[in-house]
Amino acid sequence: MKTLLVFLLLAILVAVLIGNIQVEACKDLTECDTFDICVKGRCYPSTLG
């Protein structure tokens, strides 16, 4: 019973973390900082800055 409870808690934690990562993903250049670029949902520093 304890093992099942721990497994469920871990599954919920992983789901929350995945949800947070998806929320933070950028969709276009305006969501990143001035000198950053959006590539595949993440902001990376550009070489121009």
UniProtKB/Swiss-Prot annotation:
Q: Which UniProt keywords apply?
A: Amidation, Disulfide bond, Secreted, Signal
Signal peptide location: 1-21
Q: Which residues carry this modification: Leucine amide?
A: 48
User: Which residues are part of the propeptide segment?
Assistant: 22-27
A GO term from the CC aspect: extracellular region
Please give the tissue specificity annotation from the record for this chain: Expressed in salivary glands. Highly expressed in the head, body and tail with a 2-3-fold higher expression in the head.
Q: Which family is this protein grouped under? A: Belongs to the annelide toxin family.
What is the purpose of this protein? Leech salivary gland peptide with unknown function.
Other remarks in the entry: Does not show effect on voltage-gated calcium channels, potassium channels, and tetrodotoxin-sensitive sodium channels. Does not show activity on Nav1.7/SCN9A, and shows very weak activity on cation channel TRPA1.
| The name this protein goes by in its record | Peptide HSTX-XI
**Organism in which the protein naturally occurs:** Haemadipsa sylvestris
